[in-house]
């Protein structure tokens, strides 16, 4: 009887997962806008040497810069890059 209950619960979970609706997909333009507004600001080399007065025109991306973005900091980091469009 216990194994029957386990089978019923597993089937119910399988149906719940299989019938889940996916979120509406954003267009590429909407996705680019949301990506550009997300993240931690960073100072590019063009912002100047003083971090306190810099405009922080870059955004930190984990890994490497996505397509359409370029690395704007001269030093190399394994974990993240400072990128701007």
Curated annotation (Swiss-Prot):
GO molecular function: sodium channel regulator activity; toxin activity
Paired cysteines (S-S): 42-82, 44-72, 65-83
Family matches, as Pfam families: Toxin_4 (PF00706)
Subcellular location as annotated: Secreted
Chief location bin: secreted
GO cellular component, one term: extracellular region
Propeptide: 21-36
Signal peptide (from-to): 1-20
UniProt keywords, alphabetically: Cleavage on pair of basic residues, Disulfide bond, Ion channel impairing toxin, Neurotoxin, Secreted, Signal, Toxin, Voltage-gated sodium channel impairing toxin
Tissue specificity note: Expressed in ectodermal glands and in clumps outside of the extodermal layer. Is not expressed in nematocytes. In adult female tissues, shows similar expression levels in mesenteries (gametes-producing tissue), tentacles, pharynx and physa.
Membrane-spanning ranges: none
Functional description taken from the UniProt entry: Binds to site 3 of voltage-gated sodium channels and inhibits the inactivation process. Is highly active on DmNav1/TipE (drosophila) and is only extremely weakly active on rat Nav1.4-beta-1/SCN4A-SCN1B, and on human Nav1.5-beta-1/SCN5A-beta-1. This reveals high specificity for arthropod over mammalian channels. In vivo, when released into the medium, this recombinant toxin induces impaired swimming, paralysis and death of the crustacean A.nauplii within several hours. Also causes paralysis of cherry shrimps immediately after injection at very low doses.
Other remarks on this protein: Nv1 toxin seems to be encoded by 8 different genes. 4 of them code for identical precursors, whereas 4 others code for very similar precursors. In the genome draft, 6 additional loci are also correlated to Nv1 toxin, but they are not predicted to be functional genes. This high similarity may be explained by concerted evolution.
Protein family according to the UniProt entry: Belongs to the sea anemone sodium channel inhibitory toxin family. Type II subfamily.
Identification of the protein by name: N.vectensis toxin 1 7
């Amino acid at each position: 009887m216990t194994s029957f209950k386990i089978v019923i619960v597993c089937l119910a979970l399988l149906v719940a997962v299989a019938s889940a609706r996916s979120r509406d997909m954003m267009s590429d333009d909407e996705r680019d806008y949301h990506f550009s507004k997300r993240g931690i600001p960073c100072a590019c080399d063009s912002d100047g040497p003083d971090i306190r007065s810099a405009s922080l025109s870059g955004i930190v991306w984990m890994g490497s810069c996505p397509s359409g973005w370029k690395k704007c900091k001269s030093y190399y980091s394994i974990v993240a890059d400072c990128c701007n469009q």
